[in-house]
UniProtKB/Swiss-Prot annotation:
Cysteines engaged in disulfide bonds, as pairs: none
A Pfam family: Ribosomal_S20p
Keyword field contains Chloroplast: no
The family this protein is said to belong to: Belongs to the bacterial ribosomal protein bS20 family.
Gene: rpsT
The name this protein goes by in its record: Small ribosomal subunit protein bS20
Organism of this sequence: Rickettsia rickettsii (strain Sheila Smith)
Length: 92
């Protein structure tokens, strides 16, 4: 347990930051799962839309130091490569 008031404050801030970072990390994972779901359905148009939203959230995570830049780039690259390999769904 912290004895100094500054150490107590630092401990409180750590708890607060940890909750915020977990929330942001969970949101990023959720958006990635949405893209993967659209890819599994084979819906290229919706997958592209979901990827653009996920890409935005992933890069926001990089800016907030939730994930590293290379990790984000790798995730985006792999998702976009999977979408690119899909055939265009011509059903109307």
């Amino acid at each position: 347990m912290a004895n100094h008031s500054s150490a107590k404050k630092a401990a409180r801030q750590t708890v607060k930051r940890t909750l915020i970072n977990k929330k942001r990390s969970s949101a990023i994972k959720t958006f990635i799962k949405k893209v993967v779901h659209e890819i599994s359905l084979g819906n290229k148009e919706n997958a592209n839309i979901a990827l653009s939203v996920a890409q935005s959230k992933i890069m926001q995570g990089v800016k907030k130091n939730i994930i590293k830049l290379n990790t984000a780039s790798r995730k985006i690259s792999r998702l976009s490569r999977q979408i690119k390999s899909l055939k265009v769904n011509n059903t109307l």
